Amino acid sequence: MQKNKLNEHTLTTKPRIAILLGNRQFIRSWFDTGLVQKIENAGFLVTVFAQQDVFVLLPKLSNIQIVNLGTIEPTKKSVHTVALGLVSKRSLSTTFKWKLKMQFLPPQWIFPQNGSFSLRVRAALKSLKRVLGNALDNKMTFVYLVKPCRSILHLYLRLLNEAQDIPLEIKQYSPDWLIMPSSSAQGIVTDCIVGAKSARIQTIVAIDNWDQLTGKSIYPTKPDYFTVMGQRCVEHATYIHDCDPSSVLPFGLPRFDIYRNIQHSCIVRNPANKKKVLYCGVTMAHSEKFIVDSIADFFKEKYGPDEIEIHYRPHPGPSQRSDGYEIKNNDVRITKYSNLERTAMPDMNKEFLDALLTADVIVGAPTTLMVEAMLVNRKCVLDLTIDKFHRTTSGLMANKFTHVQDLTAIQQIPQGATINGLIFEINKLLEDGSNCAHYPIDHLYNTRDRPYADQLISFLQARSSYLE
């Protein structure tokens, strides 16, 4: 597909906003929520810029131009400085340390803890082959870890003298603000921050996830402002990234505005309905299907087949598991996803919300979805179990991931470190007469704050004195 040309805009006193979408997952936050249109309606001139793979997925908007940037590769300077930052800051985040290790290690244990001797030897050889392959693929990490090599690399980058800039189409548009939804500093984000500063364009990096500041990457050059999920993210930005706290705005996440707009009163449950337990899967390799079956088998034996429904909602993008286990209990109701090509994630529609709101207890590893369950006052249990197959089980990750520790440190949230312990906590919550729970997670995300859209628009208006 050819790049489409940027239309000539008539002279206007409206502030110009350029929104750069570099990932299809941002479609949920910026288009499906109506956020792009709301900014335009608030008195701004908005143009969306997207690379080819995202552009073809975007809906048409009658009054907002969408520009195809084609395919843009990041500069070598951006690639290396972002990676070097991960190494230099690794002492400030346990996730950074883990991420560096996992560039070489497989998700499964190299020497399996069960199976026949010959099977374990074959699995070990396969894992060692993967370690060697990972070492070749990530050989530059060795350079980043050795101080003299880092000095040579910095010298090389200075001699290379690569220009870091914004795409020409954005430069020609001459925006007052460049807003970049982001899941990390990788890709063209860092180049665009540098280029925008040179062009005296104010920048906002809108962080679109929970774990970016503690686990994704470092920003070698910081934007003028970040927007983040909550107050705890402000603290991470200050401690890990040396940000000025006043430049980190805890507006929330655009796709989470739904949790600020719905009523949070506890719904009175119809006692005639079956009780429902929902297990939410995790992307990392974890023997969760065995756990789901164990939960289903226990409650079927304890209460009979017709008293409690067990639902399993797998992660839409799960890593490959090494246990080879599949659900055997035919009573388990498994969520089937429709086409995920547009955003790689399920739509946050009524069906999605009902899955959470109709559950009596929600169980899962400490993920964003479990935070969402707590935002709608569902009773929750965190799965912190380990298994014999994977080094990435939720129980082990609770000690490795900085952002996960923010959740597991909250003592009021029930946890299960073993399958029996998990079942015990679930059963206790089912027998509890209350129909909801109020966990102290306002520091992670506060549902009482104004919606992200309102806060962002107010912020832009306050800093745009030449509005019509």
Language-model segment annotations:
Residues 31-37, 256-342:
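Conserved catalytic-core segment of nucleotide-activated headgroup transferases in glycan assembly
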